[in-house]
Amino acid sequence: MTKKLSLELRQTRKPIQTACGFCHEKHLQCDVGRPCQNCRKRNIASFCRDKVKRRRKRKRSDASNFDKDEAATQTLNFNTVNPGEGSSSAMTQDEKNTGTTTATTTRTTTNFRSESKASSSTENISRAMKDPADTIIANSLLDKPTIGDTDDTGWGFGSIWTNDEYMTLNDLTSFASESMPNQLGPIEEQRSPRRTLGEPLARRYDSSQPFQYLNFGSKLHKTDSRPYISLEQPGNVPSIPAFTMNKGSNDEDASPQQKESQQMQLWQQQASQLQQQASQLQQQASQLQQQRTQQNEPVSEWTPFQLRLLIKTPKDLFDKKNLVKPHNYRKAYKDLLECLHKMFLGSYYRRQNGRWRPVSDDEDQMRRRLMRKEQLQHIAKSIGELYMPKFVALTSNMIEEDLLLQELVLQRSLLELENMSKLVNCTPICIWRRSGEICFVSNEFCSLTGFYKREILDQRRFIVEFMDHQSVVSYYDLFHEHLAFGPKDSTRTILNKDQAVYTECNLLLNNGSYLKCACCLTARRDAFNISLLLMGQFLPIFDVQ
């Protein structure tokens, strides 16, 4: 710490013109000697140098100074030429020529500076418009207006530099909006007038334009925090106009104006088709809502496809929560048993005179029929012994409001999982209830299996319908042991703690064959530790031969 000086020493010391670099940085009193005493005491005498001062930047008030010089010159000339004041001698011819030359030079210099400034600004703006992406370089090239360079136009902002930057961005984005029309909304040509130097700023720039550079093309629709985006199914992709399919030498010979007009027509047709499809879906949703409301049918009886037409966001769910009723799991399990019976024994039995009879008495058929019957009994036994007792114990004290809350939580979780599936859109995903009813399939799952999304979601379908017999047996063993109510042994594996199980299964394809896949099963539970939703992520396994 620097030692404080006495009052006498401070009074005798006088400031010097230039201090050394060390004393200047440490705010010490330096002396005129080099090296100074402070540097000698610290053994840094070899580094003692005068502090190099920065040159002061001149204020750019040349225009006002030129105006003052011009006014002073004109006043001097007027006072010299006027013969009615005093007895001073007349100006000589050389002095007149000199005064005239000075005034002319001043005016010429002022005009030249203003013209060069306007031309450089125009060149920079045009250069930036040619390359809309390089906006930062374009903004840095613009000349900053001087302090005294003002006109009689009204500025939209308090800062002239900010104003100039916003106007440049507006010009760039207006140019970009003409070259990149928006395909999400109606195609409209937005031709914004170019900024001219002679046009008053108040007229060409209003209070709503500073943020106009954020809009490219037509205005985008405001999306929710979880927008429901449904990709087109196979076979429902809008058709491409015929003239785009017949591209030949005519396109090469066409002028840029013709190509632009053809592209605009293509965009307009695609936009109109998308609008028609959106309006049709909206009409279907409104008609469906009216019919269901008149019939007082709860949301739980709707198919997942119909439900998603009505409820697309969490806000829609809570706005229409009066339509949500507890799910009828009794009917769901009844349909599941019928589905399993048809899947395992449907091809081996037929109904005759109200009774089920074997289709064939062949030994091979009998052996297969017996194996399928044992597999079905194993599934029923695991449901009765591992699942039903715990489920009854956990739900015995639940009231109707608890079931309603459970369904609301399920629908809200389903929206969240659907949103998550759009972030990992490279993995085929299927989501179903604990009863096996499918609630959601991703587009990748449809591409993997070959089924249409509406074919799966527009009716009650179970996940077991898309597996082979052995995969169904393995699924129920894993579900009852690890996923239904959590693992029996909490210290088993980390995967079980994360409520996820990895296994293999065979997925049914649209052509009737099966594809071997690696499967990750994840359970989403409620406050009663009951699984609400199960999500399966499937990746195909290709055997290397």
UniProtKB/Swiss-Prot annotation:
PROSITE patterns (alphabetical): ZN2_CY6_FUNGAL_1, ZN2_CY6_FUNGAL_2
GO CC annotations, alphabetized: nucleus
Compositionally biased tracts (Basic residues): 51-60
Location in the cell: Nucleus
DNA-binding region boundaries: 20-48
Disordered: annotated segments: 51-131, 228-270
Biased composition range(s): Low complexity: 98-110, 257-270
Biased composition (Polar residues): 72-92, 111-125
Biased composition (Basic and acidic residues): 61-71
Extent of the signal sequence: none
Record carries keyword Membrane: no
Superkingdom, taxonomy of origin: Eukaryota
Keywords carried by this UniProt record: DNA-binding, Metal-binding, Nucleus, Transcription, Transcription regulation, Zinc
Coiled-coil stretches noted in the UniProt entry, renumbered to this chain: none
Biological process, per Gene Ontology: cellular response to starvation
SMART domains according to UniProt: GAL4
A molecular function GO annotation: zinc ion binding
UniProt cross-references to Pfam families, sorted A to Z: PAS_13, Zn_clus
Sequence ranges assigned to domain PAS in this UniProt record: 416-486
Function: Transcription factor which regulates nonfermentable carbon utilization.
Annotated family: Belongs to the ERT1/acuK family.
The protein's name: Glucose starvation modulator protein 1
